[in-house]
């Protein structure tokens, strides 16, 4: 099996978590682990990344020249040498655990040694505005598919297939869920509080979005209105198109919130509307950095009006040209068919193309909880 890039795997894990984003006013501590085997190229690569809310704050990469847990946010540079030594030790323990797990799972699935395989893990906790635990989680995947997950009760596991059932049985005998629950309810919450205090100038800020609407003509004659929200933090935001005050959630195209690369985020939502009816549609923007929701409409400029008239003319001319082309092609086909009937000729056959079908916690990285 071809290995996916570690960054892609981390993004997949993040995407898998997207439907369960934290509530407004809450905060999260999450770790994403990825191990990729590479036969013939040395030991598996192991990457660990930690996030507080939507901000990456630590990273470990076994392929680095000097593999160590390193700060990824400036406020984490306040931690002393003991912290980084302990976090590096924990990351290296996980690296060894995953080397064993890759071999173990390859055996569970009866896979050859020649292929490359991946293990992914995400674990962490969400806390409310009062600092109490809202949710704890651990999810594991193998070769991009669900493998095993801790249930919401923090006591039981859901195994995706026969191999994961073996792991579940091992973890149940080791009472691993009890220790993991203790970490999620205690250590995870405590360290999240510490990180929020260290990075409060960054993590607890609220940057309101800058919003505007753009218009994009379509060949069909109608137009797309796209509502943009830029430069906001935190990432939680709601964009809703409305027609005369009624939500159009079923008719919208909505992209996932994306990092802008400067510590803020961006997002857009679009809707297709009849030409000339643009002013009936409004985009509602809700974000904790706004004192009240924004309502945005497309605001045409004089040059835009001229461009729209030109667009309408082009659309009409294009339609006329298309009709004319269809008529010409139809006439040519008719002539060819008459000639074939007169000459008794047959068209050539063709074959269609075939289808393509650590937090700082030692109680989580326990060696007796391998797969």
From Swiss-Prot:
Residues 25-114 are annotated as: Alpha-1. The chain crosses the membrane at residues 312-336. Residues 337-371 are cytoplasmic. Glycans are attached at residues 110, 280. Keywords: Glycoprotein, Immunity, Membrane, MHC I, Phosphoprotein, Signal, Transmembrane, Transmembrane helix. GO terms for biological process: antigen processing and presentation of endogenous peptide antigen via MHC class I via ER pathway, TAP-independent; antigen processing and presentation of endogenous peptide antigen via MHC class Ib; immune response; positive regulation of T cell mediated cytotoxicity. The modification Phosphoserine is found at residues 362, 365. Involved in the presentation of foreign antigens to the immune system. PANTHER family: HLA CLASS I HISTOCOMPATIBILITY ANTIGEN, C ALPHA CHAIN, MHC CLASS I-RELATED. This is RT1 class I histocompatibility antigen, AA alpha chain.
